Amino acid sequence: MINKTYESIASAVEGITDGSTIMVGGFGTAGMPSELIDGLIATGARDLTIISNNAGNGEIGLAALLMAGSVRKVVCSFPRQSDSYVFDELYRAGKIELEVVPQGNLAERIAAAGSGIGAFFSPTGYGTLLAEGKETREIDGRMYVLEMPLHADFALIKAHKGDRWGNLTYRKAARNFGPIMAMAAKTAIAQVDQVVELGELDPEHIITPGIFVQRVVAVSGAAASSIAKAI
């Protein structure tokens, strides 16, 4: 019997080791898998490479992981904003590396990894510092930059509902990078508000099929509510 559900956050993040590359879902705090991140902090794993849309908000979720000193490098599209002071302080002190990737390229590089695409050409970033050291090519009179896929050892994502096969549905903006990150990682770990019985999820509403998800863990109602308030 296929059963991808885990009883606790701690068991769901077991096996994440020093030096892992981890994708973290979320657009700001929307869809941020805060409980999984807290579980990751508790493992004590260090020297992590984090791939995410931004570099943390306030002192929760991804920012808390940065505060714990667990991260060696961040790959993201939007590292600076009014509440990204944790990352800002670490970066200015030379304690963390940064790779900036334009948001469209970030999404496409993740999707390329999940789809088995070796590389792709994008016009975004041509002629800027972001294109330094990368192959360029003229196609139909326009210049493009060769972008490589982004793979990860693990993906931490947040979904609304899941079943024991790993099928997932999302709520509104919380969906964001979750589906493509699940495809691009060797092990996708999803925290959900509710685990439902097989057949309860309308196949037309399933965004991430279970084939792309290895672990599912339910977050308690109280914990989910506290995260929602933070969002």
From Swiss-Prot:
Residue ranges that the Swiss-Prot or TrEMBL entry lists as coiled coil: none
SUPFAM superfamilies to which the protein is assigned, alphabetical: NagB/RpiA/CoA transferase-like (SSF100950)
Pfam families for the chain: CoA_trans
UniProt key word Glycoprotein: no
An example Gene Ontology biological process: beta-ketoadipate pathway
Binding site for CoA: G25, G26, F27, G28, T29, A30, G31
EC nos: 2.8.3.6
Enzyme class: transferase
Domain of life where this protein originates: Bacteria
This protein's record includes keyword Transferase: yes
InterPro entries listed in its UniProt record: 3-oxoacid_CoA-transf_A (IPR012792), CoA_trans_fam_I (IPR004165), CoA_transf_BS (IPR004163), NagB/RpiA_transferase-like (IPR037171)
Pathway(s) per entry: Aromatic compound metabolism; beta-ketoadipate pathway; acetyl-CoA and succinyl-CoA from 3-oxoadipate: step 1/2
Keywords from the UniProt entry: Aromatic hydrocarbons catabolism, Transferase
Molecular function via GO: 3-oxoadipate CoA-transferase activity
Record field: catalytic activity: 3-oxoadipate + succinyl-CoA = 3-oxoadipyl-CoA + succinate
Family note: Belongs to the 3-oxoacid CoA-transferase subunit A family.
Quaternary structure and partners: Heterodimer.
Protein's UniProt name: 3-oxoadipate CoA-transferase subunit A
Lineage of source species: Bacteria, Pseudomonadati, Pseudomonadota, Gammaproteobacteria, Pseudomonadales
